[in-house]
Amino acid sequence: MATGKIVQVIGAVVDVEFPQDAVPRVYDALEVQNGNESLVLEVQQQLGGGIVRTIAMGSSDGLRRGLAVKDLEHPIEVPVGKATLGRIMNVLGQPIDMKGDIGEEDRWAIHRAAPSYEELSSSQELLETGIKVIDLMCPFAKGGKVGLFGGAGVGKTVNMMELIRNIAIEHSGYSVFAGVGERTREGNDFYHEMTDSNVLDKVSLVYGQMNEPPGNRLRVALTGLTMAEKFRDEGRDVLLFVDNIYRYTLAGTEVSALLGRMPSAVGYQPTLAEEMGVLQERITSTKTGSITSVQAVYVPADDLTDPSPATTFAHLDATVVLSRQIASLGIYPAVDPLDSTSRQLDPLVVGQEHYDTARGVQSLLQRYQELKDIIAILGMDELSEEDKLVVARARKIQRFLSQPFFVAEVFTGSPGKYVSLKDTIRGFKGIMEGEYDHLPEQAFYMVGSIDEAVEKAKKL
């Protein structure tokens, strides 16, 4: 095992000199004793003359020139497998939840090749989430990628937690949650929420918070992904949650600047598309198992043409747009049914009935949007009988798109509901065809299946 010494420290960038015949490879992990703690460095560049440029995975405070550095001769390796479930780990796979060692059987390197073309699976199978608006309007593909776009406080995290809960309980699947550049408080809240919902033993949590150095935040998504790949290769269907993919890009920008690369558009790193591609190409399904990923996407200054969200868009199969306007009506989940899209919403994939129902719901809601201006100026009485019917049905649909969540029971006071896709299609189709025109619209608010709405109407 070769040993070198530190020759230069500039913030998170550390240059290390090795003997000419024992220079570490790019992405190898190096270890240095910094006081009582050991710090891991990752090689980014070979500068020649036996010197390598590295990025620190932790604080570089206290490092000085001349300190001995050990080459571990392999990339950063993290624990994988069932031992990671229910635990909180950092970028190096070390536990940070005070519950002792992880006791893993296996460790995998975080830098891995994406599955080869032959291994990829081309199944068009849908992943039922039990959330009506998502299953109907923007269905998820098993092994697909979903972007959750939304501002602060419209429910990105609650939606994520409900998805983890539904898949853990209804599909007995495992999930991996990677908090990339997260607020520490959010990570803490998330942990307690998972504990209260009794699904912690089905989730591995990997955190690299906002206060960590950029190298740490850039690699933490790969750590989470590696754990998910292990579950996939065991033949499981896994969910990978990344919150927030924008901060992964931002960490890459910081590292790129520290390494002295020329910035490109808007100051982003010149390798933005490649870095995003390296991550996204590994999040895929093979013939053994699938990884379905849900990624929260922060949109800087609400500009979807910003290079970061624009690069992310290219990789997504479905986009779930959370709307503040819908949240203000008290309709949760606040998914915008006219703005959210999915590649799976195709009659060849979901079937003609599902497709027609979803498009019918969209056209009714679109017509209602157009009629709103007329209603605001002239009132309901000026509408034709046909338009009055459109408004009545659209308002029922709008309310029926709401749903009580299991993870939000403490706020809503009503028990959570899981609605099968069959019941979802039946309900919306019935409303559009006028089967429930005689029921009051309040009966459709915060219920699960259409049968519950009928029951609720009897009590009103």
Curated annotation (Swiss-Prot):
GO cellular component terms given for this protein: plasma membrane; proton-transporting ATP synthase complex
SMART domains registered for this protein in UniProt: AAA
EC number of this enzyme: 7.1.2.2
A Pfam family recorded for this sequence: ATP-synt_ab_N
Entry-linked CDD domains: ATP-synt_F1_beta_C, ATP-synt_F1_beta_N, F1-ATPase_beta_CD
Binding positions (ATP): G150, G151, A152, G153, V154, G155, K156, T157
Keyword Lipid metabolism found: no
InterPro entries: AAA+_ATPase (IPR003593), ATP-synt_VA_C (IPR055190), ATP_synth_F1_bsu (IPR005722), ATPase_a/bsu_AS (IPR020003), ATPase_alpha/beta_chains (IPR050053), ATPase_F1/V1/A1_a/bsu_N (IPR004100), ATPase_F1/V1/A1_a/bsu_N_sf (IPR036121), ATPase_F1/V1/A1_a/bsu_nucl-bd (IPR000194)
Gene Ontology MF: a single term: proton-transporting ATP synthase activity, rotational mechanism
Keywords: ATP synthesis, ATP-binding, Cell inner membrane, Cell membrane, CF(1), Hydrogen ion transport, Ion transport, Membrane, Nucleotide-binding, Translocase, Transport
Top-level taxon of the source organism: Bacteria
Subcellular location(s) per record: Cell inner membrane
Annotated membrane topology: Peripheral membrane protein
Extent of the signal sequence: none
Catalytic activity annotation: ATP + H2O + 4 H(+)(in) = ADP + phosphate + 5 H(+)(out)
Role: Produces ATP from ADP in the presence of a proton gradient across the membrane. The catalytic sites are hosted primarily by the beta subunits.
Family recorded in the similarity comment: Belongs to the ATPase alpha/beta chains family.
Subunit structure and binding partners: F-type ATPases have 2 components, CF(1) - the catalytic core - and CF(0) - the membrane proton channel. CF(1) has five subunits: alpha(3), beta(3), gamma(1), delta(1), epsilon(1). CF(0) has three main subunits: a(1), b(2) and c(9-12). The alpha and beta chains form an alternating ring which encloses part of the gamma chain. CF(1) is attached to CF(0) by a central stalk formed by the gamma and epsilon chains, while a peripheral stalk is formed by the delta and b chains.
HAMAP family for this protein: ATP_synth_beta_bact
NCBIfam families referenced in this protein's UniProt entry, alphabetically: atpD
This protein's name: ATP synthase subunit beta
The species this protein was found in: Enterobacter sp. (strain 638)
